[in-house]
Amino acid sequence: MGYAQTNDLSEEDLEMFKEEVRNRINTYQMYLSFIGSKKNDNATKVVYMKQALKLFMGEGNNYRDIYDNIQPAVRTQVSSKARNTKNWIQTKNYLRNLTSLSYSEVQITQADVCYVSDFYKVRDGLYKAAMTIKQKFVGMRDGKVIYEDITEKTINVYLQQEITSVGSQYVILLGDSGVLDTY
């Protein structure tokens, strides 16, 4: 494995961060299952939405980069095998939409993390990788499956250095999530 562009972080550090990426996406998937569950009340869903958004660049809102440029809010691409379409929406709207689906029960199963790419250096203090996951969605009414699919997604992942009063540390933040395939 070559890390020519990442010479200020060791290969061991980068492997550790890749493992943390897997943990982050598992946490996000857990939040999705709570947000989509009809068993949880709206107040509980709002708590999980806020926690989920903390995993993303800008926490679901437009944000300023280190050059003080405004960057657009992170987006999630959604798809449907029934309509054979893909559309981009802001991640916070995606999460909000999960709370109001017309099914009596929604199941979003834990993602299988298929692959996390090597991190590459974007600039000082910022690295980027991509991960590929599979996610299963099941929508039911009266105990019968009305719709189900498996979606393969790619998610941008950022390793960002944050400077604090006691030094610096790297944090992992998720970025845009695109659909590769839905079946």
What does each model-identified segment do?
Residues 1-4, 157:
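Sec-dependent N-terminal signal peptides of Gram-negative exported proteins
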Residues 45-107:
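Short solvent-exposed beta->alpha transition segments
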Residues 3-50:
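Short, low-complexity N-terminal intrinsically disordered segments enriched in polar/charged residues
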